[in-house]
A protein has these predicted regions:
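Alpha-helical hydrophobic helix detector
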Residues: 17-29
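Short, flexible segments with low predicted structural confidence
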Residues: 2, 25-26, 33
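Glycine-centered recognition micro-motifs in short, flexible terminal segments and loops
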Residues: 1-18
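N-terminal export/assembly leader peptides and their processing motifs that target proteins to secretory
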Residues: 29-153
Length: 153
């Protein structure tokens, strides 16, 4: 009789242990999923904020270009870092849109521009290791640059 109770108690311990392992595993997967989704959301929000800042600078450059004459304009924009692989990011400026190309993932982003400047827009810059970039309007063209323009120094 004593052996049966001892065996039942041992089986209870084993099942309780296995239930604990199962619950801890489920919690770990759940916590990992929350962390991954949070990181992805933060990346998307940082990229969107960066794109909005650059688009606003392009609009200000367009406004300056409409003053006519030989207007030069330059504005520095700080690039917010993300946890994405930015070595695969390219930023393209077109007349009516700013495009972020993510060659290695799902973070491609487009921001519309008014395109009301007196000149054209063009430029493609890599974002690998970039901490800041410049929106420049010079000689009738608005473009992106990683280097500080000479006229601004």
């Amino acid at each position: 009789m004593g052996d049966t109770r001892a065996a039942a108690t041992e089986l209870g311990y084993i099942f309780t242990f296995l239930l604990g392992v199962l619950l801890m595993s489920m919690f770990s997967v759940w916590a990992w999923d929350i962390e991954t989704n949070t990181r992805l959301r933060w990346n998307e929000e940082a990229i969107q904020a960066n794109m909005d800042d650059i688009a606003a600078a392009v609009e200000r450059a367009d406004e300056a270009s409409r003053f006519g004459g030989n207007i030069s304009y330059a504005e520095e924009i700080a690039w917010r870092p993300t946890e994405a692989d930015e070595s695969l990011f390219w930023l393209e400026l077109h007349d009516t849109e700013l495009v972020l190309i993510d060659e290695g993932g799902p973070l491609d982003t487009t921001v519309s521009l008014s395109g009301t400047g007196a000149g054209t827009h063009e430029g493609r810059v890599p974002l690998a290791g970039v901490e800041r970039l410049w929106v420049v309007h010079d000689d009738g063209m608005t473009f992106l640059s990683l280097d500080r323009p000479q006229a601004v120094q």
